Amino acid sequence: MALLPDKEKLLRNFLRCANWEEKYLYIIELGQRLPELRDEDRSPQNSIQGCQSQVWIVMRQNAQGIIELQGDSDAAIVKGLIAVVFILYDQMTPQDIVNFDVRPWFEKMALTQHLTPSRSQGLEAMIRAIRAKAAALS
């Protein structure tokens, strides 16, 4: 995830945006930085239910026990939200992910207040799916 900022820089960059149009553009830019997802990873078992857009999230545990996340969506803003979630969960073990509450970060960014209800529900579905997969690994 070298192309993505860390949590603190994400928050700083987000708060520097002058308005919500700039913030949406920044979210879309983050999504464009995600590595390309392989075709074989766009499978039903990696599909996230509860999102209006098509969303795939792949979770693998490396030799050090750290979770590595990959994902994609057919919608630019949703792909950016995937990147935001991946930044928040970067370098975590399965147990870290289960214990980590992303909501304070979303509140600092005022993120959920400016998403449509369907995007907010999709974001919650992504987080639930990642936490459930992490719980199964921990």
UniProtKB/Swiss-Prot annotation:
Pathway: Cofactor biosynthesis; iron-sulfur cluster biosynthesis
Record key words, sorted: Cytoplasm
GO CC list: sulfurtransferase complex
Active site: C51
Pfam families named among the record's database cross-references: SufE
rRNA-binding in keyword set: no
Listed transmembrane segments: none
A single GO molecular function term of this UniProt record: sulfur carrier activity
Family, as annotated: Belongs to the SufE family.
Localization per record: Cytoplasm
GO biological process, one term: sulfur compound metabolic process
Entry protein name: Cysteine desulfuration protein SufE
